[in-house]
């Protein structure tokens, strides 16, 4: 999710992707003085550069320009298969809890995957261009997406339909819910627009100095922003004022993550300069953070996530290995129609053979 994780033990791992097609795993080892970051695995995961990585309490998913999503069981430290459905670059990934993974791609699709059997439950024709970013509401009932068709779209995940479309006149690169889900941030080039959920209108704008590449809500009122100017800035979301600024790297900042440790926040940054750095930050009295530890991966990093183990319930049926999913409908939201037009927006669902219904415009039908 978008807020700081709370660490219940000392098992913290960082997973990073890079232009060189490699996935790196590192264990964070806290100490009284300098923290250390120790390598746990290196895997040549893809045949093209990585664009996205996301974590649940058991799995890591990575997305690449090679059109595949690769899965890893972090508890067993083994590969868990690949998801093959998108036609084009995988641009964004997000787990919701332990049950679902959402993926967005260059093909304009958003796919909803079940993590139990790694089936594609639903395929949504989300944007006319590329899906550049998506974010799931903390409740799991809504999702936001932005794309190269200059629209911001809200999706009803319970009914599997488009709920709202907003023309934003520019292509947005990032969309992100706040931890409380009462607001969300949308990045367009060098600015962040803050929207309220109630009215879906902009309540403030944060102006950055250069192009923005990453965002992280440290808590509902604090937003960390990184981009092409090597610095990280932390903003008060209500006033849109910068409350902290520090130089984090020697090159552009590509990813920001965070987790809580004891009474402070650990900010994790990754850059094209190859470094992953850990910063100690007090969220109650914001001051320049202290560098806890760093590691030079010698790779051009593109994405990063924090992984921590969670409790998993033993079941008689073990999760299946991931394969290409082409013939599954969502058991929670049965789809009777293949082409659904709701409030003027067309949503195309998979039929039972993975094909799409073609033909002329039909009468409006409802998702049951």
UniProtKB/Swiss-Prot annotation:
Q: Which GO terms describe its biological process?
A: maturation of LSU-rRNA from tricistronic rRNA transcript (SSU-rRNA, 5.8S rRNA, LSU-rRNA); negative regulation of signal transduction; ribosomal large subunit biogenesis
Name one molecular function that GO assigns to this entry. protein kinase inhibitor activity
**Origin superkingdom:** Eukaryota
Keyword set includes Nucleotidyltransferase:
no
Q: Which keywords belong to this entry? A: Nucleus, Repeat, Ribosome biogenesis, Signal transduction inhibitor, WD repeat
Quote the Pfam families the UniProt record gives. Answer: WD40
Extract the coiled-coil ranges from the record.
none
Carries keyword GTP-binding?
Answer: no
Look up the record and report any one GO term of the cellular component aspect.
nucleolus
Where do the WD repeats start and stop? Answer: 45-82, 85-123, 126-165, 207-245, 248-289
Q: Where in the cell is it found?
A: Nucleus, Nucleolus
**Function text:** Negatively regulates the PAK1 kinase. PAK1 is a member of the PAK kinase family, which has been shown to play a positive role in the regulation of signaling pathways involving MAPK8 and RELA. PAK1 exists as an inactive homodimer, which is activated by binding of small GTPases such as CDC42 to an N-terminal regulatory domain. PAK1IP1 also binds to the N-terminus of PAK1, and inhibits the specific activation of PAK1 by CDC42. May be involved in ribosomal large subunit assembly.
Q: Return the PANTHER family for the record.
A: P21-ACTIVATED PROTEIN KINASE-INTERACTING PROTEIN 1, PAK1 INTERACTING PROTEIN 1
- Protein known as: p21-activated protein kinase-interacting protein 1-like
Q: Which organism is it from?
A: Danio rerio (Zebrafish)
């Amino acid at each position: 999710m978008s807020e700081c994780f709370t660490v219940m033990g000392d098992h913290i791992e960082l997973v990073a992707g890079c232009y060189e097609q490699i996935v790196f795993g590192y264990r964070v080892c806290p100490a009284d003085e300098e923290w250390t970051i120790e390598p746990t695995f290196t895997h040549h995961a893809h045949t093209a550069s990585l664009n996205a990585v996301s974590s649940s309490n058991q799995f890591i998913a990575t997305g690449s320009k090679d059109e595949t999503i690769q899965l890893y069981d972090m508890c067993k430290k083994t590969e868990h298969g690949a998801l093959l459905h998108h036609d084009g670059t995988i641009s964004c990934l997000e787990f919701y809890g332990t049950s679902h993974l959402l993926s967005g791609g260059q093909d304009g699709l958003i796919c909803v995957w079940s993590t139990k059997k790694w089936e594609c439950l639903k395929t949504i024709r989300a944007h006319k261009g590329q899906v550049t970013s998506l974010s799931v509401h903390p409740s799991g009932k809504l999702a936001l997406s932005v794309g190269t068709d200059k629209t911001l779209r809200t999706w009803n995940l319970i009914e599997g339909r488009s709920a709202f479309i907003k023309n934003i006149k520019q292509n947005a690169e990032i969309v992100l819910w706040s931890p409380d889900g009462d607001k969300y941030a949308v990045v367009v080039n060098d600015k962040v627009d803050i929207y309220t959920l109630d009215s879906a209108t902009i309540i403030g704008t944060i102006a950055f100095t250069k192009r923005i590449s990453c965002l992280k809500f440290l808590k509902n009122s604090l937003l960390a922003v990184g981009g092409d100017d090597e610095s990280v800035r932390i903003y008060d979301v209500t006033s849109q004022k910068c409350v902290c600024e520090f130089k984090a790297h020697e090159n552009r900042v590509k990813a920001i993550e965070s987790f809580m440790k004891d009474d402070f926040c650990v900010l994790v940054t990754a850059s094209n300069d190859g470094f992953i750095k850990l910063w100690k930050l007090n969220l109650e009295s914001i001051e320049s953070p202290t560098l806890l530890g760093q590691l030079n991966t010698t790779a051009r990093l593109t994405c990063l996530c924090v992984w921590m183990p969670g409790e998993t319930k033993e079941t008689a049926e073990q999760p299946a290995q991931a394969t290409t999913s082409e013939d599954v409908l969502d058991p929670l939201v049965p789809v009777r129609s293949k082409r659904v037009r709701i409030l003027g927006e067309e949503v195309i669902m998979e039929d039972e053979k993975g094909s799409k219904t073609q033909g002329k415009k039909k009468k409006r039908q409802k998702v049951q």
